[in-house]
Amino acid sequence: MNGLSLSELCCLFCCPPCPGRIAAKLAFLPPEATYSLVPEPEPGPGGAGAAPLGTLRASSGAPGRWKLHLTERADFQYSQRELDTIEVFPTKSARGNRVSCMYVRCVPGARYTVLFSHGNAVDLGQMSSFYIGLGSRLHCNIFSYDYSGYGASSGRPSERNLYADIDAAWQALRTRYGISPDSIILYGQSIGTVPTVDLASRYECAAVVLHSPLTSGMRVAFPDTKKTYCFDAFPNIEKVSKITSPVLIIHGTEDEVIDFSHGLALYERCPKAVEPLWVEGAGHNDIELYSQYLERLRRFISQELPSQRA
């Protein structure tokens, strides 16, 4: 019955877990923070000198000047020049959490900005080098954020917070930088595909990339599950059909964390999916090392988006 054993079904229906508990057990492993956001006082009306710290309006997430301080654990691979291209600031989610945001200006006048939702067990500090390299190679700017409880973001990680966090990032990207939806590519990796699919199912954008995606929390915990239960967490499989933007799905055939079958199932359920990238022999965390990864992304962005075909 739906791929679950009798004992598993009895356990589920007699003591069904809530989505939050499934999410917490399956997904969230925030690392020790590898960075901090340091407020920089702005000049007062008289020019020299600093305005009171309150003028930074950090609690509201309004524009202010912030400096990125990386620890050694961030393992930054570039020079101070590249570090200076990174802008950081906090914003606030609808659930009241401070959400740390990062904007990497890789290419002057870039046509697209990638809103990147990263995977598990990393934060913005650890991802900063990757963002610089990816944006430079794709000729896109990169905007990212940390989930509640990750990096310098406050609160605790949860499914509901994931959705509020990406909403806050989306609004910050649009209002602070004036980026229109048709210039935003939503990119989710692993657990980051959860907020990405949710946002893409509600807003149209230039494109969507799902990198090592999961279909749902229950299907990760119980691989034979065929049905989405009311207590399931991260139900990407039920939302992906609502996406109206072009979707590129990328998955490694030897993924040891989220089985390759998840990528296949989402591809089959998504009417806006383009030709996927199945990376033969790749696992969960090494797809970026294969040459076809960048090749497929470049072709998707340069040739397959509606604005490029016009």
Curated annotation (Swiss-Prot):
Gene Ontology cellular component terms for the protein in this record: dendritic spine; endosome membrane; glutamatergic synapse; intracellular membrane-bounded organelle; membrane; nuclear speck; plasma membrane; postsynaptic density membrane
GO molecular function, one term: palmitoyl-(protein) hydrolase activity
Ways its activity is controlled: Inhibited by palmostatin-B.
GO process terms (BP): negative regulation of NLRP3 inflammasome complex assembly; negative regulation of protein localization to microtubule; positive regulation of protein localization to endosome; protein depalmitoylation; protein localization to membrane; regulation of postsynapse organization
Catalytic residues as annotated in Swiss-Prot or TrEMBL: 190, 255, 284
Pfam families cross-referenced by the UniProt entry: Hydrolase_4 (PF12146)
Enzyme Commission identifier(s): 3.1.2.22
Keywords: Cell membrane, Cell projection, Endosome, Hydrolase, Lipoprotein, Membrane, Palmitate, Phosphoprotein, Postsynaptic cell membrane, Synapse
Class of this enzyme: hydrolase
Compartment list: Cell membrane; Endosome membrane; Cell projection, Dendritic spine; Postsynaptic density membrane
Reaction catalyzed: S-hexadecanoyl-L-cysteinyl-[protein] + H2O = L-cysteinyl-[protein] + hexadecanoate + H(+)
Primary location: membrane
Membrane association type: Lipid-anchor
Result for mutant: residue 190 to A: Loss of catalytic activity. No effect on its localization. No effect on NRAS plasma membrane localization
Similarity section: Belongs to the AB hydrolase superfamily. ABHD17 family.
Role according to the record: Hydrolyzes fatty acids from S-acylated cysteine residues in proteins. Has depalmitoylating activity towards NRAS. Has depalmitoylating activity towards DLG4/PSD95. May have depalmitoylating activity towards MAP6.
Protein name per its UniProtKB record: Alpha/beta hydrolase domain-containing protein 17A
Organism: Homo sapiens (Human)
